[in-house]
Amino acid sequence: MRGGVREKKIVCGSVYQEVDLIPLRKECRAGEPQGRESSEKQKRANQRAAERHFVQLVNANFVRKGVLLVDLTYVGGEEPEDFERADRNMVNYLRRVCYLSAKRKLPKPAFVAVTEGGAEGTGEENHRLHHHIILYAPGLTRDEVENLWSTGRGWKRHSLGRVNTRRAQPVRGSLIERAMYMLKAPKHKKRWHQSLGLKKPVLKINDARYTKRQVLRWCTNGDAYDRVFWEKKYPSWQVEEANVEFNEIEGAYYIRLRMWRSKSPWSRE
């Protein structure tokens, strides 16, 4: 270990990645824990980590052509009686999408999805139930995807409500905005689903690239806040955000970078 700074690079597909620069305690090495936090602080940290992982998972799997952003709601008379019924409606919808793809011998769909209600633990959690999905179902048209939001069979089949479907258009190589939209209202009751086989973000750790002295100098002279400065450190990447935080207890700086490929292979349909 050289100087006690870890570069933690999270590679999410070919066009998006995040980089954390973390001060290491003297006894830490790659793969070792860095100590324990209080239960409440750890709970908040776990929540932030889960949200970051979701953003990374979305960008690792859905920055590609043909991805659809699907929002499902209910019309009067079709509102589910409770959260569980609403969630089953969405699961059944995703099963119909997968069944139609399999019937046509198309690639297996990939998705992340959430059922959302009102504030959890209150009488409001069954109000305004709705669903958000990021869907990759190559070979299916938008009309077909929308028509599957229904119930019943044959002449009894009818729509459950409104479907808002649009093509994903990543901003600067990522779908952060959509992911954060799905994470909104953290106090609301939510249930998450994802298809099997999604690619995991790739974690790369380097404890020898930077030193504490370097990081301290960059944070105090302002370089650490400059996106152009970091773009020189990571050629072919454009830095979208450089976030610097000072931990008063540890007396050390933490740096978090978000970046995307300057020559993104993405093109809008």
What is the predicted role of each segment?
Residues M1-H127, A137-E269:
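Right-hand nucleic-acid polymerase module
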Residues I133-I134:
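Long, low-complexity, serine/threonine/proline-rich intrinsically disordered regulatory regions
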Residues H130:
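Conserved, short, structured surface segments that act as functional micro-motifs
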